[in-house]
Amino acid sequence: MSKWIHETVGGWTLHLLLPPSYADGGHYPVVYIQDGGAVARACSNLLDHYYRTGRLPEVILVGIEPPNRNDDYTPWPLPALTASFSSFGGHGRAYLHTIIKQLKPHVDSNYRTLSDRANTGIMGCSLGGLISLYAATEFPHVFGKVGALSASMWYEGFLDYMTGQSWSDRSELKLYMYVGSLEGIYKQNIQAHMLDYTRAAVRAILAKGYPADRLNYVEEEGGTHDMLFFAKHFPEALEWLFT
């Protein structure tokens, strides 16, 4: 059975899920997960089943608790969508630098990891998916596996940013993207167009030369923006990224 370990590194709280065979030795790929790894906790039993049945190679999962997700998971500042929510600070690049310069070195030094790009992933849901895609474009030399579940593609300017990237030179990157057909169904703002923005992003990535066999894009009919669907697709994303 997988084992949770909790620790604090430089003021950042980490929740690590070590795979079932970790105590037996060996080195493992690592995936850094936004929102404290909540999506991994929601499907930890299913992950163990995937391990036992050989569907998924064992990996170390590192959930990172965000001090302020509206700041840490956004690439540039934007005003709040509504008066009841806070604005977006746009500290995403600094957050990713913290992962690369502080958290990843700690994990690689204290756990038996495979630390190269091909064995290092980053994943997240919603805004966590957005910052994971941003990591794919800004730091492809660090993160070779990227999973974006229901990424907040509505974020103003991000689709244009994605379209402006040179995806043909990122052929060593492996990318998984998921979205549900009913994302944003009850929203009255830009979030209502979540599905359209995600589809447009996928078209842009492929049009800019990214190899189609390196991108797994999944839509679920009836899928909404909640943990039920995030947790369902998280193990499938890991399976595709690491097999």
At which residue positions do the language-model features occur?
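Non-catalytic cap/lid and distal C-terminal segments of serine-dependent acyl enzymes
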Residues: 1-243
